[in-house]
Swiss-Prot record:
Protein name, per record: Small ribosomal subunit protein eS1
UniProt feature, compositional bias: Basic residues: 1-19
Compartments (UniProt record): Cytoplasm; Nucleus
Any GO MF annotation of the entry: structural constituent of ribosome
Subcellular location, principal: cytoplasm
Gene Ontology biological process terms, A to Z: translation
Region described as Disordered: spans on this chain: 1-23
Tree of life domain: Eukaryota
Stated family: Belongs to the eukaryotic ribosomal protein eS1 family.
InterPro entries (alphabetical): Ribosomal_eS1, Ribosomal_eS1_euk
Amino acid sequence: MALGKNKRISKGGKRGKRGKAQETMARKEWYDVVAPANFEKRQFAKTICNKTQGTRIAADVLRGRVFEANLADLNQSAGEEEAYRKVRFTVQEVQGRNLLTQFHSMEVTTDKMASLLRKWCTTMETTVEVKTADGYTMRLFVVAFTKPQANQQSRNCYAKQRLVKWLRMRITKMIKRRLSKVQIKEAVSLLTRNVLSDALVRRCNPILPLRELRIRKVRVVRTPKFDAQALLSAHGTIPASVEADQREVEEAVEAAPAAEKAAE
């Protein structure tokens, strides 16, 4: 009977030749996420990434990451009144241990939208797509709710269809006129500080009395070619991270004993 190799039996290897297990966190670095200059709190988050090793560059891995923050945390002077809005940023450039971000989207929380719904009124929604002066295409979702007129006897406050169409047309024209003349930095300030929504309420109230008008969602659907100078001008002076300096000192102190042992 011929004997052959039995594939079911694993070949025994040399024992004791396993490499020393390296700690996972030793291969990683911490980075600070920096918001543009039109927000009060600049460094609002931290993230972790593997160190540059061979052809795998850390900066390439970090670009494109999206981070979410609460608007009340970014603009602390506004207080808890702005806690119902979430702002997202996308990383565009890596500068040392700082990640320079740009506006990605903004959205109203689900519980806030649920609290605005009422019976006996008309809910109007419209979508507006506008291109800023520096080439960013933004899509805005606006929602409005009617309210009873003064001295009204009827229980409901439903709006006629022709007035709803007129309201949508005015909202669309005003948003395009205001945002098409400014850059992305000024457009974000108009949206986050309620300047645009307040102007829409003043212009739409003569047509229909509105109980609420909210820009419930904003998305950047198309971006221009990356411009490093424009990104740096949007960020202005980038605050230094004291913790990052401490981390570099700790890494240098840990590397010194290892170098002394190698010399011996």
